[in-house]
């Protein structure tokens, strides 16, 4: 069932996928992968508060789950709770210093808080680990343009 739900998400059939995740969680209420994927699906539908609840639920079961922490940070960022998002990314980075997604996402949140020079450092750091990380490159280019325009 998890594979079917994932495939539906790939096809952007999020509402249908939710039903599969709900069925999975009825059977295996502590399936962390299903909980996180359910949260991501809710997030894709713009149901951020519910997504946040799912990530918190996953973290209650497995407190150091990097996927749940990064996704929680992403939702908090979307909700403009940048400091809280950064806290999530900091936990990830305390567990995995080379996590390029957490580094780049932290840069995005730092940038939204107005510290563009610091954001640039995070994007460069992510690119030093993975020089093909598109999000970091696009974010770096955008941040540099912002710096030039001010």
Describe the residue ranges of each PLM region.
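Alpha-helical segment of the N-proximal tetratricopeptide repeat
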Residues: 1-33, 37-44
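Helix-start (N-cap) detector for alpha-helical repeat units in TPR-like alpha-solenoids
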Residues: 32-33, 66-67, 100-101, 134-135
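Position-specific recognition of the canonical hydrophobic site in helix A of tetratricopeptide repeat
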Residues: 9, 36, 43, 70, ...
